Amino acid sequence: MPKALIQTYGCTLNQADSDAMEAILKGRGIDVEREGSASDDNYDYVIINTCTVKTATEQRILERLKRLQKLGRRLIVTGCMASANEDKVLGAAPDSSLVTTSNTHRIADALSDISNGSRAVYDAYVKPEKQGHFRGEGSAIARIPISEGCLSSCSFCETKFARGPLNSFSSNVILRSIEMAIKGGAREIELTSQDTGAYGADRRTDIAELVHAASELDGDFRIRIGMLNPEHLHKYIDSLIDAYKSDNVYKFAHLPVQSGSDRVLRDMGRNYLVEEFEGMANELKSKIPEISIATDMIVGYPTESDPDFEMSMRLIERVGFSRINVSRFSKRPHAGASKLKQLKSEVVKQRCISMYRLSRRMEIGSLTKVVGERRTILLTERNADSITGRDQSYRQVALREPGFRVGEFVDVEIIGNTPACLIGRPVGTVNKIEQVSYFRS
């Protein structure tokens, strides 16, 4: 039986694409491994699903491609670099085959071409109806893609160049994927896309309607809503708040503000003001008291001044985010900001250190405030020495007691925390589910 390795870099949408490619290849009788646990010599094909968001990640990918080219591996490159930076891919691995983001459904055809001695290239832009595929195999998480592309034109990002304009998938297809995943044993449903906040703008619907419909499906499960661009949130915030009230929906929102300065937001092409963002965040917290809000911040955007940076720091303090993903500005070749004069590296470095320290303090504070409380958590993944789950606010909780299985809902007392997660002690089990074979540890 032919054997393929799929290695994935980047976002949850990329992971969902890899899930789909894995399902397609297994359906064709190909043995598939993910991320690699053995030598590259053990695989007939190596599929690298790439990311183009950060320069550092891109450099790691290019080094990986160079090594595989040198080893003479039969290599397929997919993901955003295959779509946006084909020249860099071929510079590192001239013999590699290319499958762009909208053509991942052709992955089996690409392997067939290669086995017949041809170099495969599937790069025509198409608008597929992608489906979610639940892997199982020790996890209770199903990643369900709901759209591809976006409506925005952010000056720091070239992902739109890779994935194109917004293409929302049919809600019927999405709901069928969720139903199949739940029947297969999934308990956490991750709705993922480049921007879930834009979902449905091309279909006269929105993410709130989709979440509401999904939450009414049969079964015990939790829905995690993916990243929501604040630009779109005001259009449906009331109906989204109603959707959050379902027990089947995590009280969690990922709202990437990127800067606390209106001037920098304008330069970035972000179509909202800080006051508008803060108002929406406060409304969510007011009407859903248990909600946790995560955000992204870019440090060192070329036009960011010292006062602009301080505005970002103060915004973090005022909103009280549960998680802050701090990223140093990364110059991307197809993004408008790449043409701007860059800030001095030492200035950006010191700003990153300051924001990271503040972020860690805020994140730890959001964890310590729930120590001593009871929570019902969904166990989603088993690690080497613990099993971890999520509470209703999507905070990670680790248990060290044996005897529990992925997919169970467990009542715990929060007895402590690390800088990254809560530590729980079981006080009883609720909603025990019938175990299926791939949940066995």
PLM regions: where:
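Proteins enriched for Cys/Gly/acidic motifs involved in redox and nucleic-acid/cofactor modification
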Residues: 1-198, 253, 275-286, 310-318, ...
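Thr-Gly-centered strand-to-loop micro-motif
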Residues: 8, 324, 399-400
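Terminal RNA-binding accessory module
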Residues: 331, 338-441
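Generic beta-strand/beta-sheet core signal
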Residues: 7, 192-194, 226, 256-258, ...
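Glycine-centered loop/turn positions within well-structured domains
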Residues: 105, 152, 164, 197, ...
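Conserved SAM/AdoMet-binding glycine-rich loop
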Residues: 75-79, 84-85, 183-306, 317
